[in-house]
A protein has these predicted regions:
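Sequence-level detector for compositionally biased, low-complexity segments
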Residues: 1-177
């Protein structure tokens, strides 16, 4: 297990990723042997526990603001889903009523591919319009309002995972290689 944790940590090392970026795109990664094996294994275990057990981590204390959308309510409609993030303000707009704020800058720097984990979640929960009218009429489609509370909880937990992952990877930068 320690070897697996060590490899997981090395593959998350920002210096390793930067130095071997081109190689990582073209071939299988080569794992260097760093002097303090057990420190790297401990970081890898911590990262793995965060990434695998993201549903069990404590939710980050984001401020939630709910302002009723009187227009939508008067028309008998659900709030309009937006699912937009503004990293510069540290806010996430879920719909025309709900905004989460207090997202720390570190949460936006943890990337899964080319997007932050938070942006990835927002993209996955967006309502998509089906092009085929037959399917649209006859089948029950996804509605964000049915999953809103689940998404709020998930965003808070993934914020915790992102912040803690960035803290660990920043500590890796200072380690001797």
């Amino acid at each position: 297990e320690a070897i697996f944790h060590y490899c997981y940590a090395v593959l998350h090392d920002p210096i390793y990723r930067e130095k071997y970026a081109l190689n990582l795109k073209r071939e299988f990664p080569r794992i260097p042997f760093y002097p303090d094996f057990w420190q790297w294994a401990a970081w890898g275990e911590a990262l793995m526990n965060l990434h695998i057990g993201y549903e069990a981590v404590a939710p980050f204390a984001l401020a939630r603001r709910d302002v009723p959308d009187e227009k939508a309510r008067a028309a008998g409609l659900a709030p309009k889903a937006m699912l937009r993030a503004d990293a510069s303000l540290g806010t996430i707009s879920l719909d025309s009523e709900t905004t989460l704020s207090g997202v720390p800058p570190e949460a936006w720097t943890y990337k899964l591919g080319n997007r932050s984990a938070l942006e990835w979640i927002l993209d996955q929960y967006k309502e998509k319009k089906l092009k085929d009218p037959t399917i649209r009429e006859k089948f029950d489609t996804y509605r964000f309002k049915d999953y809103k509370e689940k998404v709020v909880d998930l965003l808070m937990r993934v914020t915790t995972v992102s912040v803690e992952t960035v803290a660990i990877t920043e500590a890796m930068k200072a380690e001797k290689r």
